[in-house]
């Protein structure tokens, strides 16, 4: 039994012994070795905040295409809202949004608001810290990045990614939730199978390429997984991360591991030094780090 088989077997055993409500696990190696175990029907499910990493990939492609830079002020993309923006909002950059360091303590938008543009709500929210200095996990940051992409491409986030990423990964006709105004939510609401989620990890592990096609630059992937902000604590509704945060991706620099993470046990974990990708879809209630903790022990 090789190392990958041992990790797969150990993870499968731990999931079953702990009685975790896992839908499926997929392991890939760089040699296209693949192991799959499904406990339920192989269908697309909401990967929750693991979707955020696709937002980052979209930003990287926009950078590659010369449509924006990470140092651009997000307010410059919304000239119509400049008169309403709170003081200091002009300091918030694309990079700040990627690192969840906008300086605004707004996590998500109220569900009962349907007649006001979410972008306006974000821009007029007051700053609580200097942009770029303090991590504050925020679905609003991901949403705003999607709106920036719309501004520079003329397409919704989802539509922009279809020919550039989803089709190339074999993720056909993706479904991604929208806000009341019809803009891709970005932060959550993307439905994928466990294997489709794993393809994101293969793209990252290969430095921005998949099946020989370059999708996003290797330089962006390196920055995405190394340019981090300290993120040891999350909101009380989430388990502690014990990691730092790159460009919409969690990073454990000491272990040289990074991952996309959605609540209730959605993971796409990349272990570069093992040439290994592990994806998991689940519904863990209450939410916990049980799956990630198990994987950390096995590797």
Residues covered by each model-derived region:
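A short, well-structured edge-of-sheet supersecondary motif
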Residues: 7-41, 268-269, 275-279
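Active-site Gly/Thr loop motif
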Residues: 223-277
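Active-site helix/loop module of the DD-peptidase/beta-lactamase fold
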Residues: 65-100, 152-192
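Flexible glycine/proline-enriched surface loops and loop-helix/loop-strand junctions
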Residues: 40, 126-130, 141-143, 179-185
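Short, gly/Ser/Thr-rich active-site loops of penicillin-recognizing serine hydrolases
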Residues: 290-299
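Active-site SXXK
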Residues: 46-71, 97, 145-149, 197-200
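Active-site-proximal alpha-helical segments within enzyme catalytic domains
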Residues: 144-148, 186-209, 266-281
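Short, charged, amphipathic alpha-helices and their helix-cap/turn boundaries
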Residues: 29, 33-34, 75, 107-131, ...
């Amino acid at each position: 039994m090789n190392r990958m088989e041992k990790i797969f077997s150990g993870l499968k055993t731990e999931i079953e012994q702990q009685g975790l409500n896992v839908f499926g696990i997929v392991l890939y190696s760089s040699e296209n070795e693949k192991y799959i175990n499904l406990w339920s029907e192989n269908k697309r499910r909401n990967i929750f905040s693991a979707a955020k990493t696709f937002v980052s990939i979209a930003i990287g492609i926009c950078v590659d295409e010369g449509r924006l830079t990470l140092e651009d002020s997000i307010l410059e993309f919304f000239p119509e809202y400049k008169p309403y923006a709170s003081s200091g909002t002009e300091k918030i950059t694309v990079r700040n949004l990627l690192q969840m360091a906008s300086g605004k303590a707004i996590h998500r938008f109220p569900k009962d608001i349907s007649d006001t543009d979410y972008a306006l709500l974000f821009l007029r929210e007051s700053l609580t810290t200097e942009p770029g200095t303090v991590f504050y996990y925020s679905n609003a940051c991901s949403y705003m990045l999607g709106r920036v992409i719309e501004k520079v491409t003329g397409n919704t986030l989802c539509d922009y990614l279809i020919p550039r990423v989803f089709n190339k990964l074999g993720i056909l006709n993706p479904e991604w939730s929208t806000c009341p105004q019809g803009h891709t939510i970005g932060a959550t609401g993307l439905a994928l199978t466990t294997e489709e989620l794993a393809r994101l990890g293969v793209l990252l592990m290969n430095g921005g390429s998949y099946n020989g096609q370059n999708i996003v630059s290797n330089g962006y992937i390196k920055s995405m997984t190394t340019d981090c902000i300290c993120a040891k604590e999350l909101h009380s509704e989430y388990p502690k991360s014990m990691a730092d945060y790159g460009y919409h991706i969690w990073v454990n620099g000491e272990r040289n591991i990074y991952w996309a993470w959605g609540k209730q046990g959605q993971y796409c974990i990349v272990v570069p030094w093992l040439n290994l990708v592990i994806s998991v879809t689940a519904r863990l209630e209450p939410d916990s780090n049980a799956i990630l903790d198990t994987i950390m022990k096995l590797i």
